[in-house]
Amino acid sequence: MAGCCCLSAEEKESQRISAEIERQLRRDKKDARRELKLLLLGTGESGKSTFIKQMRIIHGSGYSDEDRKGFTKLVYQNIFTAMQAMIRAMDTLRIQYVCEQNKENAQIIREVEVDKVSMLSREQVEAIKQLWQDPGIQECYDRRREYQLSDSAKYYLTDIDRIATPSFVPTQQDVLRVRVPTTGIIEYPFDLENIIFRMVDVGGQRSERRKWIHCFESVTSIIFLVALSEYDQVLAECDNENRMEESKALFKTIITYPWFLNSSVILFLNKKDLLEEKIMYSHLISYFPEYTGPKQDVRAARDFILKLYQDQNPDKEKVIYSHFTCATDTDNIRFVFAAVKDTILQLNLREFNLV
């Protein structure tokens, strides 16, 4: 009888394996719950891709020398895209070059096939430098709200000497400022305090938005980005629609979707640095007549824009968490995301057995 209680070595091993499998299954189930899905939304050029890059710098592996070298061609292409946009705008806005030689320089840049650019020739660099110094081009740059020009244009063009050196390797800031429109869906998972934050970036242009629907399952939080500086700009896809009006309408659509009833909403009012610069010469009241605050007042402008978005929320019980951000400033994003992470974890305490 006593012999029945004694397990053979094989049976003991079999039980051990079964117990291990059970433990692993429990761990897997727990791990599946320990993943947060953050959906990054917003209209085109609001800063979503830059924010993802910051997550890689702050919470991931960052950008090695080799990674940064991979952005060299894109930096060159951004420079040509910006300069060609200004050259075209010189014609449409009927601005004259002050230096006659710049008509020829403009032709040199016009002939460049941007998507085939992989280097900068000496002739091209000289043409870019002379054009950028021309008072006509500077006037054209000052009127950039009247056409489409990337926010990084001035950053790259004022630093053309550094970028044109043969040994040029893009810095972290160069990488953050590279503009490549997001097509399709980009996922970036990173681990924080044993919880996986899966950040999903989708294209913001209208043509990309129909792809969003597949991302809507089990979203923990929506992070919606607004470009504060777009209050006086029109859409790339439709030149008589105000960008901020489009963004505001999209925000209302997103927060009233049935899919997101249980998702927290975090609003990033981004590009605060550009707003501070622009509000000094482009008055908010010219584009939003309901604005009653003083001119050239950054705080009043920020508060007004925040309220515009808060007013889109029909459910007064639902809290919208808001932060003013500058997506190209790593310290700012590190600070803001620490607060966001705490908010998300607080809201999901029970799910992660933290209470």
From Swiss-Prot:
Q: Which InterPro entries match?
A: Gprotein_alpha_Q, Gprotein_alpha_su, GproteinA_insert, P-loop_NTPase
Work out whether the entry's keyword set contains Transferase: no
Task: Spell out the molecular function terms from Gene Ontology.
Answer: G protein-coupled receptor binding; G-protein beta/gamma-subunit complex binding; GTP binding; GTPase activity; metal ion binding
Chain segments carrying region G3 motif? 197-206
Q: Which UniProt keywords apply?
A: ADP-ribosylation, GTP-binding, Magnesium, Metal-binding, Nucleotide-binding, Transducer
What's in the GO CC field? cytoplasm; extracellular exosome; heterotrimeric G-protein complex; plasma membrane
Binding of GTP: at which residues? 42-49, 176-182, 201-205, 270-273, 327
**List of residues that carry ADP-ribosylarginine:** 179
Where are the stretches annotated G2 motif?
Answer: 174-182
Q: Which residues form the G-alpha domain?
A: 34-355
Could you tell me which residues belong to the region G5 motif?
325-330
The Swiss-Prot or TrEMBL record describes its family as follows:
Belongs to the G-alpha family. G(q) subfamily.
Oligomeric state and partners? Answer: G proteins are composed of 3 units; alpha, beta and gamma. The alpha chain contains the guanine nucleotide binding site.
Protein name in UniProt? Guanine nucleotide-binding protein subunit alpha-14
Species whose genome carries this gene: Homo sapiens (Human)
